[in-house]
Structures are given as structure tokens and as C-alpha cells.
Amino acid sequence: MTIDSHQHFWRYDAARDGWITDSMSMLKRDFLPKDLEGECNANGIDATIAVQADQSEAETLFLLELAEGSKRIAGVVGWVDLRSPRVEERLQFFSQRERLRGFRHIAQAEPDERHLVSRDFRRGIARLREFGFTYDILIYPRQLAAAIELVTQFPEQRFVVDHMAKPEIKAGSREPWATGMRTIAQNSNVYCKLSGLVTEANWNHWKPEDMIPYLDVVLEAFGPKRLMFGSDWPVCLLAAGYGHVKQLVESYVEVNAAEHKHDIFGGNAKRFYGVKADIHGLAA
């Protein structure tokens, strides 16, 4: 089963989706499962993980509604207020929804670089494992220190770093990002998504060679059993089509980890998110 571990859906709302700036005007429209279907068919994608783009429970319910009407969406990474004193009650509520596999907070936007290890946030993280939920870490390199501290404090909790922690590819900078990624990868409960690369590069003039030093770092650090392909569709469209994004990662894997291609393009995501092929009518 080939899985895209990271894509988004939304019904565009200018007031809500303020992160979509004028420089991203092509994203100022609806992106729904019917819009992704052709891309999945053309690129051999059996299943996807739909990830939240808005920080509200309404977003989580919206994605679950889409997933429950689709065999293609194998899982949802939603949002819940992990800082709320009612977090256990909300996790209990969401645990009844089979397609919900985990949660994410847009930590990259938090002004406090240590938000991930704040007392209230850690209290919420501490409840996830009880319900079998994963956690997606969305950060910039400057927040890696806090992320390392977080994952070390919760060694039994499954974490995945989204978009390789957004290295500064356009600037050609690798440190201190590389050191941070090697450090966080020492925790066996942490995975990493090979996603979001093209939008960290020069949108109009990137080339595959720009990405290789960064891919080399995470392959060496995490190993092929803790990496997973993600398209970051439709955000990737700012810099590349779906097929180009998949080909970028596929070409790298075929040269550097060919025997683990099945893992990186499905097996690892299936294991991490607990995707059950028989439930979704998908081939294993």
C-alpha cells in the first residue's frame, strides 16, 4: 500500500485562512478529495493521511467527515487544545472516531520557542498515549531544542517531525538544523516526514540537487524505517506539481535506500499511524 502521509483539505475562508498570503494566491480556493483523486490515481497513491491546517475542533470534525466518506483517506491528524484543562474529556470524545489517528498544533507559529515544553502543553501530550494518538511536530529549526526536550520526556509517545523541521534550503543553510535533527533522531519514538521540501527551496528555481544534502542528513539520522513520504498537497503546488514532488523523493530513495522504498512510501506511515488496510478496503 502506497501512502501519502501528509496532505490537506480546506474550504477556503479568507478570514480563517489568513496564513494563505497574497504570494500564495493560487491556494485561495477550495481543495477537497475530488481535487486530489486524479493526482492519487496518476501517481499510484492508495491512501493518504489528511492533516489539519486550522486550529479548531471544527477542523478536526471537517476532516473526519471527509475521511468517513472516502476510502482514500486512511487517517486524520486533527487538532485539539492540548493546553485545555478539559483535554482528557476531548480526547475521550475523539477516541470514538476510528479514522482519527493523531493531533498536531501549529507550533511553528508560536512566539514562544519553548511552547512545546510549556507545562500545560506537556500535560496534554501526556494524555495522548492512553488513547493511542500520535503527535505531529510542526516546527522551524529554531524550535528543535524544545522538540528534543519534549520527545525525550515522553519516550513511549509516537512523534513525527513534519517537513523535516523546515530546513533553510533556499539559503543553503544546514546548521544548526542538521545537528538538531541528528539529536532528535536518537529517540526511537520519533519519525520524520520527507515532505514540504520544495516550499522551503526557491519556489521558481529549485532543482533536485538542492534537496540532497538535507535528505542525506535525515536518512543517516533516522534510518529508512522511520522516514515517510508526504506530498504536502496542495501547499506543494506553490513550487511543484504533485508528480514532481513524489518523483523528487522517489528518485532519491531509489538511489540511496532502494530496498526500503516500500517502507518509506507506505509501510512506515501505516505502522506509525496504525492504518488498517482491511478497514479501508485497500491493498496491503
Stretches found by the model and what they are:
Residues 6, 48, 63, 76, ...:
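Conserved, mostly hydrophobic/aromatic
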Residues 56-142, 149-151, 193-197, 204-205:
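Active-site gating/metal-coordination segments in enzymes
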Residues 58-74, 155-161, 211-220, 242-252:
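Short, electropositive alpha-helical surface patch
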Residues 115-228, 279-284:
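Catalytic pocket-lining loop regions of alpha/beta-barrel enzymes
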